[in-house]
């Protein structure tokens, strides 16, 4: 972790948005489709969710997801990072993992983890069976935003920024 504060940093640009994806253990879940998963959540199925740390985008995602489903905040288990969360989802420590695709792609490809709902409007080619929240009529889009920053006070004229990325600053 950095000891820098926001006041000590200057943004350079956004790198990417990684949509939040709700994933389940393929072998241990009763949900075989995104529709079954959403129906179960709306019906009040008691599920334990996992994410990275407390107070992060994962934690906020679980809260907002439950709220959109008309449910109270479920049990949330914080893990040290996405890799640990994906491993613990496979092990059965949680019922649902709030992950980005890059954090669990190997487990998805192995058939251990099944992505259910992409909290975005755009489908993702590597996970064609997952549905977007928008496709399912759920107005909830959340992503991990990744970007670049430098120390505040750096003369930005010394940093080459290509024209296509300049509007992102």
Predicted regions: what is each one?
Residues 1, 81-82, 99-104, 119-121, ...:
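Beta->alpha turn/N-cap motifs
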Residues 1-4, 106-118:
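Extracytoplasmic "Venus flytrap"/periplasmic binding protein-like
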Residues 2-84, 133, 138, 143-162, ...:
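Hinge/capping helix and adjacent helix->loop/strand transition within the periplasmic-binding protein
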Residues 10, 37, 112-124:
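Conserved helix-loop-beta element of the AMP-binding
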Residues 39-41, 64, 68, 83-97, ...:
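Short helices/loops that flank or line small-molecule/ion binding pockets
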Residues 48-50, 97, 116:
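Short, well-ordered beta-strand segments
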Residues 125-129:
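Short, charged, surface-exposed secondary-structure boundary motifs
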């Amino acid at each position: 972790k950095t000891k820098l504060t926001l006041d000590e940093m200057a943004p350079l640009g956004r790198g990417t948005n990684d949509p939040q994806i709700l994933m389940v253990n393929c072998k241990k879940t009763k949900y075989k489709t995104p529709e079954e998963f959403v129906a179960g959540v709306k019906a009040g199925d008691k599920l334990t969710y996992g994410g990275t740390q407390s107070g992060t985008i994962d934690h906020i995602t679980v809260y907002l997801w439950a709220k959109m489903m008309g449910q109270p905040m479920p049990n949330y288990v914080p893990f040290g990072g996405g890799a640990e969360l994906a491993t613990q989802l496979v092990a059965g420590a949680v019922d649902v993992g709030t992950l980005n695709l890059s954090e669990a792609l190997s487990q998805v490809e192995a058939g251990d983890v099944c992505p259910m709902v992409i909290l975005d409007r755009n489908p993702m080619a590597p996970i064609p069976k997952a549905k977007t929240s928008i496709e399912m009529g759920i107005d909830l889009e959340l992503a991990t935003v990744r970007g670049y920053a430098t120390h505040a006070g750096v003369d930005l004229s010394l940093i080459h920024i290509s024209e296509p990325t300049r509007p992102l600053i």
